[in-house]
């Protein structure tokens, strides 16, 4: 009590002081795993913490460790050869999704109230939907965001973290109710149908928004071909540094220790008339 009186807590600076949290394994944590989930990097340790871990610590969170994720965060399920599968706490025979699957499992099971995630192609949204959590995919430049159980927790973190402050983007209008919100009951994969449970959830959300005064309109046909989007997203990984680095020392003997996606994207950068096809060098 005397120490607290002499050194009072600055709750404005550390609003989450003492709250236990976990960091996604892809988010660098000092003295923690730094393998990117690649089996060939087994035992590699981080010398320092990355931006997410530093931000969590600055806000007062007590970081207990790191969570599971797929190799290089590429897959939408969490099952790397290095760390194995992330079990869904609602049904351990099922996966938590990916790539922030370990974080989703940890929060959904009650291990911690918050765990960091990252999302480019669904890596927060998919695990959240598979485990019943709130998973916000913020505006483009804010790709790092935690997984939590309630929208109140998501709002509290988003308002306090410096990682969410816009730097170059146009500020949103003050009166959000002037914006028109679109929704659809179609999927971008045109041969697939939404489940009745998903449709019910969407329509309940639409009803809520309309009661709150928002203008909501249905889009009858999804404007994007999801299969073309998947192709573009995948091809975009060709030549990416992390994939090239992962296959740099691959041999015929150890290449089975790599995820086929990693191997394919990493070696594709060597294809071409002047390419060096010796990926073992």
Regions picked out by a protein language model, each given a short descriptive name:
Residues 27-29, 69-70, 121-123, 189, ...:
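Solvent-exposed loop/turn segments at secondary-structure junctions
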Residues 1-42, 73-74, 172-174, 243:
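Short, well-ordered alpha-helical
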Residues 45, 49-52, 202-206:
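Short catalytic helix/loop segments, enriched in acidic residues and glycine
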Residues 48-50, 54-155:
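Short glycine/serine-rich loop segments
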Residues 36-47, 182-185, 190:
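Peri-catalytic substrate-binding/gating loops that frame the active-site cleft of hydrolases
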Residues 22, 40-44, 144-149, 272-274:
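Short, well-ordered beta-strand elements within core beta-sheets of diverse protein domains
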């Amino acid at each position: 009590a005397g120490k607290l009186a002499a050194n009072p807590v600055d709750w404005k600076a550390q609003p989450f002081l003492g709250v236990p949290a976990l960091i996604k394994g892809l988010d660098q944590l000092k003295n923690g795993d730094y393998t990117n989930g690649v089996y060939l990097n087994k035992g590699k340790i981080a010398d320092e913490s990355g931006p997410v871990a530093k931000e969590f610590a600055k806000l007062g969170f007590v970081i207990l460790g790191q969570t599971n994720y797929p190799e290089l965060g590429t897959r939408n399920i969490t099952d790397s050869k290095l760390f194995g599968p992330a079990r869904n706490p609602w049904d351990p025979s099922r996966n938590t999704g990916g790539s922030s699957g370990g974080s989703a499992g940890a929060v959904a099971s009650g291990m911690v109230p918050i765990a960091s995630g990252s999302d480019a192609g669904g890596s927060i949204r998919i695990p959240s939907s598979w485990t019943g959590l709130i998973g916000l995919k913020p505006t483009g430049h804010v790709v790092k965001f935690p997984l939590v159980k309630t929208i109140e927790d998501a709002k509290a973190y988003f308002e306090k973290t410096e990682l969410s402050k816009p730097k170059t983007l146009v500020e949103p209008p003050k009166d959000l109710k002037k914006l028109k919100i679109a929704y659809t009951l179609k999927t971008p994969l045109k041969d697939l149908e939404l489940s009745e449970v998903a449709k019910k959830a969407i329509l309940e959300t639409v009803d809520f928004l309309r009661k709150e005064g928002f203008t909501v309109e249905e889009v009858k046909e999804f404007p994007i071909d999801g299969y073309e989007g998947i192709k573009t997203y995948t091809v975009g990984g060709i030549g990416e540094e992390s994939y090239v680095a992962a296959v740099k020392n691959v041999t015929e003997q150890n290449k089975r220790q790599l995820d086929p996606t990693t191997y394919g994207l990493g070696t594709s950068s060597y294809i071409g008339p002047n390419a060096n096809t010796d990926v073992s060098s």
